Amino acid sequence: MMSQTELLRKKSHPVDQALTPEEIQQYLTVLDGWSLQGLHIAKSFEFKNYYQTIAFVNAIAFIVHTEDHHPELEVGYNRCVVKFYTHSVNEGLGGISENDFICAAKIDALAGNQFAPMSH
């Protein structure tokens, strides 16, 4: 199984097939706080204030633009929920791919280094 460090070194790339449910569960064990929510992997990040939340969203925008793999974001005053899903896999039916986990790992690294989510 791939480690978070190995995911950080990878770059998103075109894929045709989604991961199997077993593969998804294996990847979820590598990333802290991410969970399967319907057809997405998702994680909620909390911040001290609106400014930190929006700074985090802007930093995410840079990462996902570079990776060419864009999440759905739910943004509130002090919270951002990030959801990944790959629309292009399974002949356009969609699913979860390694690209979702690559980007999730990069967002976790960003949050851990610069935006440290508040503990509950």
Swiss-Prot record:
Provide the coiled-coil residue spans.
Answer: none
GO biological process annotation, one example: tetrahydrobiopterin biosynthetic process
The answer on whether this UniProt entry bears the keyword Ubl conjugation reads no
Which cysteines are cross-linked by disulfides? none
Q: State one molecular function term (GO).
A: 4-alpha-hydroxytetrahydrobiopterin dehydratase activity
SUPFAM superfamilies with a match to the protein in the record: PCD-like
One Pfam family matching this protein: Pterin_4a
Q: Which InterPro entries match?
A: PCD_sf, Pterin_deHydtase
EC number(s) on file = 4.2.1.96
Q: Where is the signal peptide?
A: none
Q: Which UniProt keywords apply?
A: Lyase
Q: Keyword Lipid metabolism, does the record have it?
A: no
Top enzyme class: lyase
Which reactions is this enzyme annotated as catalysing? (4aS,6R)-4a-hydroxy-L-erythro-5,6,7,8-tetrahydrobiopterin = (6R)-L-erythro-6,7-dihydrobiopterin + H2O
Q: Which PANTHER family match?
A: PTERIN-4-ALPHA-CARBINOLAMINE DEHYDRATASE (PTHR12599:SF0)
Q: Which family does it belong to?
A: Belongs to the pterin-4-alpha-carbinolamine dehydratase family.
HAMAP family the UniProt entry points to: Pterin_4_alpha (MF_00434)
Give the protein name, as stated in the record. Putative pterin-4-alpha-carbinolamine dehydratase
